[in-house]
């Protein structure tokens, strides 16, 4: 008997066993493979305030009911290059500008538009946060319901600069406002600006986020004079990259399909829950989990194969059974045992082997899973899946295991 060949054949057979229950026995291997399916007993969509912290772009204005209220932007206190002042002094971060030989002439904040050519009737404006001691915003938590509005009055209106390769939105910052950033008595200043827009009834504008990479990152430029001696004054500049940013958006009104199907959307803040009842079933003694597939079927026929969706087993006990809005995320995920999947041929299959193996070992029969879009999915796409009432495409859980 060629055991290497037999084990290879078994492995290939395991891969093919997906759609229905199978039982394979081999006198020499003494192994069998079983698949058991469970129906979803409950499913619903819920909404939380949208958070765009993972997006590669920033938005201002409004479009299709979305209101892009503000961009919150954090500047690095460290300069991109060090400027040598003397043997004992260099400029490498904000507070280093406080030197008797340094005079700040002007400060400019530039944001990079995605489009090369911009024609704007809107008015962009800039604020900052001189009286806020904390970090102002978090890309994972800040939204239109909890944003910090303790900002200054408008300190500048932006100008658009266009050259042959790019378009930029430029703000000029008076050095008096920049003093908060370089104050040596507050080395942990928030370093945050808020960029807003007026007269944007029909327009929205798209900028590169710091998440998009170094080649398109926006910058703060500090122009200053260095007085070396009575006869030598050097005019130069330092740049500081934007290291963190976030679009604050208000979502549009939902349509019926958003709430009657199992829907996920970044910009609408839509996520979905499903609950599986495995009743008294447990994996037979000595068996090994091969996979535990949670399967959904999309309603959207144009869903891209690149759409990545994440799923987590929830550890809470109470869940809504109808569409519900929350002011903040109300559930606790088992993050370490999460699963991600790509939509393929209108089907989405998560392997929740680790999460379910753990839950079943704890004698749990009800298992509730969350599904939500990955941070790099098109934020304005709503992906909808058939719910538990579908006669043919309802979601299901299918566990495959190997029994010696």
Residue ranges and their predicted role:
Residues 2-7, 17-404:
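Secreted, disulfide-rich extracellular signaling modules
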């Amino acid at each position: 008997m060629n055991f290497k060949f037999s084990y290879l054949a078994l492995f290939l057979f395991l891969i093919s066993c997906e759609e229905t229950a199978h039982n394979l026995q081999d006198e020499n291997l003494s192994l069998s493979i079983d698949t058991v399916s469970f129906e979803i007993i409950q499913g619903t969509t819920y909404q939380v305030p949208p958070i765009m912290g993972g997006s590669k772009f920033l938005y201002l204005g409004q479009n299709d009911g979305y209101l892009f209220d503000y961009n919150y932007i954090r500047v690095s206190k460290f300069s991109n290059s060090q400027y040598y002042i003397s043997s004992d002094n260099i400029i490498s971060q904000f507070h280093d500008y406080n030197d008797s030989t340094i005079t700040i002439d002007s400060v400019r904040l530039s944001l990079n538009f995605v489009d090369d050519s911009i024609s704007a009737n809107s008015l962009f404006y800039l604020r900052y946060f001189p009286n806020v001691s904390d970090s102002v915003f978090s890309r994972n938590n800040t939204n239109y319901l909890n944003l910090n509005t303790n900002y200054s009055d408008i300190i500048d209106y932006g100008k658009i600069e266009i050259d042959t390769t790019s378009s930029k939105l430029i703000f000029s910052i008076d050095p008096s406002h920049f003093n908060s950033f370089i104050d040596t008595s507050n080395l942990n200043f928030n370093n945050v600006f808020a960029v807003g827009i007026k007269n944007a009834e029909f327009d929205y504008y798209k900028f590169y986020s710091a998440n998009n990479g170094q080649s398109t990152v926006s910058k703060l430029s500090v122009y200053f004079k260095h007085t070396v001696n009575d006869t030598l004054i050097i005019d130069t500049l330092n740049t500081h990259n934007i290291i963190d940013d976030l679009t604050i958006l208000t979502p549009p009104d939902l349509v019926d399909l958003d709430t009657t199907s199992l829907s996920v959307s970044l910009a609408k803040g839509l996520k979905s829950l499903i609950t599986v009842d495995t009743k008294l079933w447990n994996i037979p003694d000595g068996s090994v989990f091969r996979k535990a597939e949670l399967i959904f079927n999309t309603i959207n026929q144009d869903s891209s194969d690149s759409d990545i969706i994440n799923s987590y087993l929830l550890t809470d006990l109470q869940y809504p059974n109808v569409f519900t809005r929350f002011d903040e995320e109300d559930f606790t995920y088992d993050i370490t045992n999460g699963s991600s999947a790509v939509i393929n041929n209108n089907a989405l299959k998560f392997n929740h082997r680790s999460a379910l193996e753990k839950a079943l070992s704890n004698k749990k029969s009800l298992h509730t899973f969350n599904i939500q879009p990955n941070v790099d999915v098109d934020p304005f796409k709503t992906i909808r899946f058939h719910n538990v009432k579908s006669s043919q495409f309802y979601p299901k859980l299918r566990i495959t295991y190997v029994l010696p």
